[in-house]
UniProtKB/Swiss-Prot annotation:
Protein name in the entry: Teashirt homolog 3
Distribution of this protein across tissues and organs: Expressed in cortical neurons.
UniProt keyword Zinc-finger, yes or no: yes
Ranges of the DNA-binding region feature: 882-952
Chief localization: nucleus
GO terms, biological process: in utero embryonic development; kidney morphogenesis; kidney smooth muscle cell differentiation; long-term synaptic potentiation; lung development; metanephros development; musculoskeletal movement; negative regulation of DNA-templated transcription
Zinc finger (C2H2-type): 204-228, 265-289, 376-400, 967-989, 1032-1055
Organism: Rattus norvegicus
Annotated Low complexity bias: 791-815, 847-860
Length: 1072
């Protein structure tokens, strides 16, 4: 290695002794490597030993010990090369006196970095000299031609490697290289093979003389000088792996398979593959191909990849804002500039690989890296990125992900379409505000609100100051636009639509509600015409669960408003958009954007009179509720965007709340009912009245109850509410009143069973409150938000009555259920139709105690209630603890379902029966009558179909696939051959005809059932095993049967009792 000490370095030792120690110390890399035990060498460079820099750190001591191990082997060629250099030195020094200091600094920097330790430890060298300077001025005559002088222009691989290193050193000063390869996916190679490639710690050994070297460069130099290699790299190499034998350790081909090795050990210029690193090095030496591999400025450093996520977070937050538009989009935005990006795009090899250069054998990672740059590429602007995180950050910061969502939409991801060019104003604000959000969004995938909240509150404070400072419309518009942008950034993590999205007009030509509606319609059609392939099939019909509710809840989608896209609508900032959270009517009150605040004040005045009366009534539940509410600190809202938007619209009032988590919650509660003229009060009352109440009434009253039965959007709404709402129940933090209402009405009795009125009122008050603090974007979106213009006719006049309703209803209505629904409706003048529908629904619900639970898991609890009330009044005995496979089914419900299923069978021309799905209406009727949720019915049907397809039979139907089906009656065990006979047989058990199911109201059916006492008596005459003297009653469910056989069958099938126990559960009744 002493051979590396070039003439200039020695000259410097003598001529510029004063410079050298400073340099050395500054470099922090003592020139330990230049010292060798040989005396002649010591004499040759005395100043290296005497200089202060010669004190060794433990690390360098270590590396020197490595050197001394092998120095004896190297002595032969070291001494000769030293003599050569000493000869040339005499010639060179006089020529070079003028330039010696320049090249000296360069060479020292290079050598220190390149040779001093295997870790390439962090150098804080301020070297910005271009590599060309180094090539011209620095002669390293370590190659076999010792006569090369500084100006000779002999450009060998060693110079090139140094040039490369010089480049890297200048820009990648901070790189901790040891973990370099953790980011390059060469995981297949065992670290034993080339330990130092991966760790930098062990040795490269020469195959011939076993000399060990710290770097691949040194090994290659050694091979070059001593001739310890065979130049077998011919064209045939690829096809002829059998050459002179290599130790097994050195042969990647043998270890890992030919393909892997060839992919990795490949000359980047000519594409030849090699068996070992040595062969590759030799090839590079001989062909000079290393000079032809493109080597431009290195791109963004590895640091971005290497720093752990914990450290990445702060750096992102600090640095992203400074250059949000940098095409590199990497966290270290300052280091990547546009030229890097251009080079990256123009040349596949200008990729992160350059930062490794030839160090540590990293050259064979180039191929992978080159490909990676093609993969991690922004589809919009084409910039390449080193890691997925960087690409994500780039997309977030520049908003490019929005522009490529078309394809995503086609693949079915629910992403908002947005206009391609955001307006200037929006962009300006994005730069300031949305960037940190993007960072937080992408760095903290955890949904813990805490991680995001501080950032948001800061944002909000910024916004407050801004808005207070400038109240005229322009800045406000900008703010709102940027708020939208922020909102989008946050929610982009989820890719969910929000109500806000629905309110915006379809600039991009995409009407969300329309497309949603089409999707749902096609889904429903699929569900009706056969089992579709998608997994949501069984639950889609939950949509049709509450007919009246459907009629009220959501307008015909035809009328749905066009939606404004997310970005770039700062020109159109109309109240509708301003109060996206707030929802329709609030915006209707203030048609002119600039009169937002005045409109609010007027509205507040109107509302205060009405609400003041109710204030006292509400205060009690409110105060009860506020502590729990406060428990969810407001920053949670950062997890979704509404509060931010809300905050934009409602000016300073709302912001104070955001910034002081607990008290504002209270304020919100007291303020909204009492509408205190505090600004808080103003803002909140408005949204309250607007969004939660008249919004819905506007929609409800707008279309008549005669509307077609199943509106796709209402279907979707209901499904979302049932499933999302249900799922999110644990994390109560946020549902809006609309979706809450849907959810409640869908599982009303279930709640009624467990909840006493106070909790329900509490819950109700909570939604009113939660309306402003949506904490989870995961809550069901309220599709009605999109219909803002439908209720335009409802002016502020409508709002004031409306706004009183929540308070009044919750205080006056005692039943939990009614309060829930009525609170959702409002006392608005136009509400009669809606309310009458709701009252009908409530009547049905309360009288039958039906529970509309949406999950199959609650079927048992549900049908115990259902069965009890629907079948006979006296059936509600403690039959709740049934066991067995069908314990959760009320037998009567099964009969209805089986009959309906049989009715849906269609006979083909060949005489076989095919299954067709029940129409939503039929399911609806069953659901209304039995109280089973649509989901449950759909699951049952899907299960039956699955069994029939798979095995050709199910419990009540066998041999369907043969064309000669046999139907089994659950009650009396009769076997029937045709669907029509089976249906009439089941109808005789039920006591009514299936086609009457839709016409009969629940009361009529209940009465009918009560009159017929036991439907099975009706079919006694037709029962083959009838015993005229007695009927048999099941003690568990009080049903009566015509024969012992039937009751035993019933006990085993329905209650899972074994035949031995039958006598315990059967009582004989005399016929009356």
């Amino acid at each position: 290695m002493a051979a590396y000490v070039s003439d200039e370095l020695k000259a410097a030792a003598l001529v510029e002794d004063d410079i050298e120690p400073e340099e050395q110390v500054a470099d922090g890399e003592p020139s330990a490597k230049y010292m060798c035990p040989e005396k002649e060498l010591s004499k040759a460079c005395p100043s290296y030993q005497n200089s202060p820099a010669a004190e060794f750190s433990s690390h360098e001591m270590d590396s020197e010990s490595h050197i001394s191990e092998t120095s004896d082997r190297m002595a032969d060629f070291e001494s000769s090369s030293i003599k050569n250099e000493e000869e040339t030195k005499e010639v060179q020094v006089p020529l070079e006196d003028t330039t010696v200091s320049d090249s000296l600094e360069q060479m020292k920097a290079v050598y220190n970095n390149f040779l001093s330790n295997s870790y390439w430890s962090n150098l804080n060298l301020n070297l910005h000299q271009p590599s060309s300077e180094n090539n011209g001025g620095g002669s390293s005559s370590s190659s076999s031609s010792s006569s090369s002088s500084c100006g000779s222009g002999s450009f060998d691989w060693h110079q090139s490697a140094m040039a490369k290193t010089l480049q890297q050193v200048s820009q990648n000063r901070m790189l901790p290289e040891p973990s370099l390869f953790s980011t390059v996916q060469l995981y297949r190679q065992s670290s034993k093979l080339y330990g130092s490639i991966f760790t930098g710690a062990s040795k490269f050994r020469c195959k011939d003389c076993s000399a060990a070297y710290d770097t691949l460069v040194e090994l290659t130099v050694h091979m070059n000088e001593t001739g310890h290699y065979r130049d077998d790299n011919h064209e045939t190499d690829n096809n002829n792996p059998k050459r002179w034998s290599k130790p097994r350790k050195r042969s990647l081909l043998e270890m890992e398979g030919k393909e892997d090795a060839q992919k990795v050990l490949k000359c980047m210029y000519c594409g030849h593959s090699f068996e070992s690193l040595q062969d590759l090095s030799v090839h590079m030496i001989k062909t000079k191909h290393y000079q032809k591999v493109p080597l431009k400025e290195p791109v963004t450093p590895v640091a971005a990849k290497i720093i752990p996520a914990a450290r990445k977070k702060p750096s992102l937050e600090l640095e992203l804002p400074s250059s949000p538009d940098s095409t590199g989009g990497t966290p270290k935005a300052t280091l990547s500039d546009a030229s890097d990006a251009l080079q990256k795009n123009s040349n596949p090899y200008i990729t992160p690989n350059n930062r490794y250069g030839h160090q540590n054998g990293a050259s064979y990672a180039w191929h992978f890296e080159a490909r990676k740059s093609q993969i991690l590429k922004c589809m919009e602007c084409g910039s390449s990125h080193d890691t997925l995180q960087e690409l994500t950050a780039h997309m977030m910061v520049t908003g490019h992900f929005i522009k490529v969502t078309n394809s995503a939409m086609k693949k079915g991801k629910p992403i908002m379409e947005t206009p391609v060019t955001p307006t200037i104003t929006t962009l300006l604000d994005e730069k300031v505000q949305s960037v940190p959000l993007a960072a937080t969004t992408f760095t903290s995938p955890s949904n813990t609100p805490a991680s995001v909240s501080p950032k948001l509150t800061v944002e909000i404070k910024k916004e407050v100051d801004k808005e207070k400072a400038v109240l005229d419309e322009k800045p406000k518009e900008k703010e709102k636009a940027s708020e939208e942008e922020e909102k989008y950034d946050i929610s982009s993590k989820y890719h969910y639509l929000t109500e806000n999205d629905l309110e915006e007009s379809p600039k991009g030509g995409l009407d969300i509600l329309k497309s949603l509606e089409n999707t749902v319609t096609s889904a429903i059609n699929k569900a009706q015409n056969g089992t579709p392939s998608w997994g949501g099939y069984p639950s889609i019909h939950a949509a049709y669960q509450l007919p009246n509710m459907m009629k009220l809840s959501l307008g015909s989608s035809g009328k749905s408003t066009p939606l404004k896209p997310m970005f770039g609508n700062s020109e159109i900032v109309s109240p509708t958009k301003t109060q996206t959270l707030v929802s329709p009517p609030s915006s209707q009150t203030s048609p002119m954007p600039k009169t937002n605040f005045h409109a609010m004040e007027e509205l507040v005045k109107k509302v205060t009179e009405k609400v003041a009366k109710v204030e006292e009534k509400m205060k009690e539940p409110d105060s009860k509720l506020s502590p729990p509410k406060r428990a969810t600190p407001s920053p949670c809202s950062s997890e979704q965007s509404e509060p931010i938007k809300m905050e934009a619209s409602s000016g300073s009032g709302f912001k104070s709340q955001e910034n002081s988590p607990s008290p504002p919650r209270d304020v919100c509660k007291e303020a909204s009912p009492s509408a205190e003229p505090v600004e808080n009060g103003k803002e909140l009352v408005k949204p309250l009245s607007g969004g939660s109440l008249s919004g819905s009434t506007a929609i409800i009253t707008d279309h008549p109850p005669e509307q077609p039965f199943v509106n796709p959007l209402s279907a979707l709404q209901s499904v979302m509410n049932i499933h999302l709402g249900k799922a999110a129940k644990p994390s109560l933090p946020a549902l809006d009143p609309m979706s809450m209402l849907f959810k409640m009405s869908n599982s009303l009795a279930e709640k009624a069973a467990v909840a006493t009125p106070p909790p329900l009122q509490a819950k109700k008050a909570e939604h009113l409150d939660r309306y402003f603090y949506h904490v989870n974007n995961d809550q069901p979106i309220d599709l009605t938000k999109g219909k803002s213009d439908k209720g335009c006719s409802l002016g502020s006049g409508l709002l004031s009555p409306t706004s009183t309703s929540p308070a009044t209803s919750s205080s006056t209505v005692t039943t939990a259920k009614t309060s829930a629904v009525v609170s959702f409706m409002s006392n608005s003048p136009l509400r009669e139709n809606a309310l009458s529908d709701i009252s009908d629904m409530l009547k049905n619900l309360t009288e039958s105690h039906t529970s509309k639970s949406s999950t199959p898991s609650s079927i048992s609890e549900k049908s115990d209630i259902d069965g009890a009330t629907l079948e006979e009044a006296e059936e509600s005995t403690p039959a709740q603890k049934r066991k067995g496979r069908q314990s959760n089914w009320n037998p009567q419900h099964l009969l209805i379902l089986q009959a309906q299923f049989a009715a849906s069978l269609r006979q083909t021309s060949e005489g076989k029966y095919i299954m067709s799905d029940l129409s939503p209406q039929e399911r609806m009727h069953i659901s209304r009558f039995t109280g089973l949720s649509m989901t449950t019915i759909s699951h049952w049907l899907a299960n039956v179909k699955y069994q029939l397809r798979r095995t050709g039979g199910t419990k009540f139907l066998k041999n369907l696939d043969t064309g000669h089906p046999v139907f089994f009656c659950n009650d009396c065990a009769s076997q029937i051959r045709t669907p029509s006979t089976y249906i009439s047989h089941l109808e005789s058990h039920l006591g009514f005809r299936l086609r009457d199911l839709s016409k009969l109201s629940t009361e009529q059916i209940n009465n009918q059932i009560a009159q017929t006492k036991s439907p099975s008596e009706k079919m006694v005459t037709s029962s083959p095993e009838e015993d005229l003297g007695t009927t048999y009653q099941c003690k568990l469910c009080n049903r009566t049967f015509a024969s012992k056989h039937a009751v035993k069958l019933h006990l085993s099938k329905t209650h899972g009792k074994s035949p031995e126990d039958h006598l315990l559960f059967v009582s004989e009744l005399e016929k009356q």
